[in-house]
Design a protein with these regions (language model features):
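Extracellular or lumenal secretory-pathway regions
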Residues: 1-298, 305-503, 507-524, 528
Length: 531
């Protein structure tokens, strides 16, 4: 009965689910917590640079279009770790500081970024020129004179590494001295600003999985698990006019988005979520596309919508991106408020899904949905991103109207591609694959096997007991028992007769003969017979 009880208890109580719920949480000591502190994911950023090969011909009027050469990939491994973790029980959140390091992966790269050289836009000069032209004639004239004095050129020739991770610029250095509250750096690198800046100082506050009601159902009005609540105390983008009193709009909120490291375990095909990274300077909507699998692991594939970077003054989901009711062209998303108001923008690579007019000034751009679509793959049992994830976007320099600056006038009202990146996840490590297989198949199979084994053993014991009660031992066994008892009585009687004979006999036995008698010696028997 004990085995039947425990076997039934395993099937009814489902202790495996309770164990998984405890281990797949962010509570200290849990398995997921240990994985989350230092995620064992191989995340890589493939960087493709744009090399401007005919700048002199274009600026001199001898070429109608700029020729772009895509150079790459230069691959960097992103290593994430989470620090300064604090649990906030009253509001069911967790506070932490994510730190990302970028390690060059030469075996995956096309060349050495410190050796390879490109010619690309001078981002500080072009950015400040656009800002000055929008202010006044005197500002534009003054900046033009300073640029000539510093010999700043619209296009720079330098190593790929310096352009990505930082180079000293005289104009930036000058600005850092005169307007330190605005420009607080002396070198500039596009990858440095997009991915590394503020890397160790951003404090995230994230919602833990929502509590259940007394019936075990998810509380509907609670924040979704593993969504961002605030960053550095801000729940929205002030640069996009977030209003704390009204909780903002879908356009300028941060709260409710995911940082792309953890997702709820109860996701399904109807889910839609938002990705946040400072690089985007906005939330990016991601919608379910299909159920798929990688290396035998279940997966949900989500895709970014073609209009993810659009801005429309009449659409509340994107109207905040239109400053003074002026929007950028279709498919171009401004990120200026997050980068010192330098006119930068993000698009899909090669201006895919953007206004076709953006392609007209260039040769060498080829939009390709098969190559440039962004997909996000989530493993539903673990709630983690996995192989097949590709987040692809392009960084661009926005050049507006140029006044009183002859060097910059050839690039007026152009959006110049700088680079595009493919942030992707390589094959999951063996430990994660084993864990996911265990969650889906191994652990449930062990639980069912244990429960079934206990039930079968319990049924066998119960049946055996019932058979003994219904069919007691037969008479044949009683007869055999009587024969065995009779034989024993005869042996005992013979022994008693022998003892009596010894007592009456006058024969004296020496010790050796007594031992022979006890252990079956035959030489003493005749003496006993004569006695």
């Amino acid at each position: 009965m004990t085995l039947l009880f425990f076997g039934s208890l395993v099937l009814i109580a489902d202790p495996l689910q309770s164990i998984l719920d405890a281990q797949l949480s962010l509570r200290p000591g849990a398995l997921l917590h240990r994985l989350w502190l230092s995620p064992p994911l191989d995340v890589y950023i493939n960087v493709y640079m744009f090399n401007y090969t005919n700048v002199d011909e274009f600026t001199a009027g001898r070429a109608a279009k700029l020729q772009l050469q895509e150079v790459g990939p230069y691959v960097y491994k992103e290593v994430l770790s989470n620090h300064n973790v604090t649990y906030n029980e009253p509001n069911n959140t967790i506070t932490f500081v994510p730190k990302r390091e970028y390690v060059f992966a030469p075996e995956r790269s096309v060349g050495d970024p410190k050796v390879d050289r490109i010619r690309a836009p001078n981002i500080p000069l072009m950015g400040v020129t656009t800002l000055a032209s929008s202010l006044s004639m005197f500002a534009a004239l003054g900046l033009s004179a300073i640029a000539r004095q510093l010999d700043s050129q619209p296009m720079l020739e330098m190593s790929v590494h310096d352009y990505m991770w930082g180079y000293e610029d005289h104009l930036v250095e000058l600005a850092s001295r005169f307007v330190p509250n605005w420009i607080d750096f002396k070198s500039f690198g596009i990858m440095e600003k997009l991915f590394r800046e503020g890397n160790e100082s951003n404090v995230f506050n994230m919602n833990l999985p929502e509590p259940n009601d007394k019936y075990g159902a998810r509380v509907t009005d609670a924040p979704r698990g593993y969504t961002v609540d605030s960053i550095n105390g801000e729940r929205g983008f002030k640069g996009w006019d977030y209003n704390e009193e009204t909780n903002g709009t879908m356009c300028n909120r941060i709260w409710g988005s995911h940082d792309a490291t953890l997702f709820p375990l109860d996701m399904d095909e109807n889910d839609e979520f938002f990705l946040y990274r400072r690089t985007f300077c906005r939330r990016l909507p991601v919608k379910f596309n299909r159920t798929t699998s990688y290396n035998g692991l279940d997966a949900y594939e989500f895709v970014m919508e073609p209009d993810s970077f659009d801005s429309d003054v009449d659409n509340t989901n994107s109207s905040c991106y239109c400053k003074n009711k002026r929007c950028l062209k279709k498919g171009v998303g401004s990120v200026s408020p997050c980068y010192y108001n330098i006119p930068l923008a993000i698009t899909y690579p090669h201006f895919m899904h953007a206004d076709p007019s953006l392609l007209e000034p260039f040769e060498g751009l080829q939009p390709d949905e098969a190559r440039f679509t962004s997909t996000f793959v989530v493993q539903p049992q673990l709630g983690a991103p996995m192989q097949g994830t590709h987040l692809r976007l392009q960084a661009n320099q926005v050049v507006g109207k140029v006044n009183f600056n002859r060097m910059m006038s050839p690039f007026e009202n152009m959006i110049l591609p700088l680079l595009w990146v493919d942030l992707n996840i390589d094959v999951l490590c063996l430990s994660l694959r084993l864990l996911i297989h265990g969650i889906k198949w191994g652990f449930p199979l062990l639980q069912w096997s244990a429960a079934l084994g206990m039930l079968l053993a319990g049924v066998y014991q119960l049946c055996s007991a019932l058979m003994l009660c219904i069919w007691p031992p037969t008479k044949q066994f009683h007869k055999v028992d009587q024969v065995e008892r009779g034989t024993a009585i005869q042996v005992i009687g013979a022994g008693l007769s022998l003892a009596t004979g010894l007592r009456k006999s006058s024969l004296q036995l020496d010790p050796e003969e007594q031992l022979n008698l006890l252990f079956g010696g035959g030489s003493i028997i005749p003496k006993l017979a004569k006695a």
